[in-house]
Amino acid sequence: MVPVIALVGRPNVGKSTMFNRLTKTRDAIVGDLSGLTRDRQYGDASWQGRSYILIDTGGITGDEVGMDEKMAEQSLMAIEEADYVLFLVDARAGMTAADQMIAEHLRKRNKEAILVANKIDNIDADVARAEFSPLGMGNAIPVAGSQGRGINALMEAVLGHIPRDPVEDALDEDVAEGEEATRIPGPSEKDGIKIAIIGRPNVGKSTLVNRMLGEERVVVYDQPGTTRDSIYIPFERDGEKYTFIDTAGVRKRGKIHEEVEKFSVVKTLQAIKDANVVIFVMDAREGVVDHDLNLLGFALDAGRAVVIALNKWDGMEPGERDYVKTELERRLFFVDFADIHFISALHGTGVGHLYKSVQAAFMSAVTRWPTSRLTQILEDAISVHQPPLVNGRRIKLRYAHLGGANPPLIVIHGNQTDKIPNSYSRYLENTYRRVLKLVGTPIRIEYKGGDNPFEGKKNTLTDRQVNKKRRLMSHHKKAEKKRRDKRK
């Protein structure tokens, strides 16, 4: 299971800055005013091949009322959700009563917490660490979140004991030249292909799992939120091993009231991260709603292969079906690489075809290709459509290699790669998808510019070059003097 890390602390200790630093985004609001984070925010992050989910929370002071009280509830709930807690304190401001209150709460909950002394820039880190020793949370790890100082030491303390993703290890060695494309080790022999069934509440996820399994393994009731936790169900079909991850439906934030249902959100996000393929279930009778797009977007951001299942297709009139198909084409244009199935989980119509799409999406996500193959595709694409000119110079792309899997990451090396427009990146992405016959999985293109070996080096002349330069300068001076004399 992908670990969950929560950032907690009193207001304005740098939690949102740390969130942005670790997730490499600017999703969290950052400022000098306390209370800018009003709700839990989830982010997808990784460190040295180890993926995790990060939760940013509002500050806790212990004397909250009104909106601040709701914010504190969100922070305490994040502590319950998390596997690890990063307890941030302000090294400049020193220890406060709010810090002591949070430390006491963490001890009562028996949570694995690491004390983080933030904002240690321009102050003595050892003195700052000693000031917080009365909290009884062990030695504080000094960091400067705004500058990135101490982040590696912090993440080593949190995630250093967790094994690297086997996919990352498999990519450490490239496919040998001339070798055929091979599958990168992904699912274990025990679990098989892990499939997360996700979607809004009451779209028929548990009914679909039961239909695909052929037995009643998950509680099904016509009421949203019947499944309160993610359920892992191993099974075998046609000699292939699978593990279903059935999740609670994710509701809009404003509709989440019960505490147990709030916990289900992080379970769904964990299931997406833990899966190899996501079956995204939608209600055909309700069509495409904004919350579907948000949930689908998280699956794509996590890089998961996707199969879309439009449930409750039976009983719909032809005109209604045509309208839904038009809406799918219009609103799901960003995931046009995913197979779409029109099914009835209740009656079993079209359900059996999902397995073929799951297999195809999984193989597309974890297959690796030799550098020679990826480079040849790049050269063929350039011969058809060259990169644009920048300041009169043509962008040069030299070679490509595989940099990751699930999703496939193709790293392209060249010059002026930071000037490549998005339209050309989409062209290359579509070319790789078409030639490699990839379905169901997103593709990521990453560029690396060529390093100038002489950058930063002073051009020092040898003694021989210095003498030659002097002779040339002397010759030029004599020649110039002769030309001036002739003019006279």
Curated annotation (Swiss-Prot):
Superkingdom field: Bacteria
Claim: Repeat is one of the keywords in the record: yes
Domain KH-like: 367-451
Residue intervals of the EngA-type G domain: 3-166, 193-366
InterPro entries noted in UniProt: G_ENGA, GTP-bd, GTPase_Der, KH_dom-like, KH_dom-like_a/b, P-loop_NTPase, Small_GTP-bd
Bias type Basic and acidic residues, positions: 449-461
GO biological process: ribosome biogenesis
List of residues binding GTP 2: 199-206, 246-250, 311-314
Keyword hit for Manganese: no
Record-listed GTP 1 binding positions: 9-16, 56-60, 118-121
Regions of compositional bias (Basic residues) in chain numbering: 467-488
Residue numbers spanned by region Disordered: 449-488
Keyword terms, alphabetized: GTP-binding, Nucleotide-binding, Repeat, Ribosome biogenesis
CDD domains given in the database record: EngA1, EngA2
Family matches, as PROSITE patterns: G_ENGA
Similarity-based family: Belongs to the TRAFAC class TrmE-Era-EngA-EngB-Septin-like GTPase superfamily. EngA (Der) GTPase family.
Alphabetical list of HAMAP family matching this protein: GTPase_Der (MF_00195)
NCBIfam families, per the entry: GTPase_EngA, small_GTP
Subunit architecture: Associates with the 50S ribosomal subunit.
Record function comment: GTPase that plays an essential role in the late steps of ribosome biogenesis.
UniProt protein name: GTPase Der
Gene, per the UniProt record: der
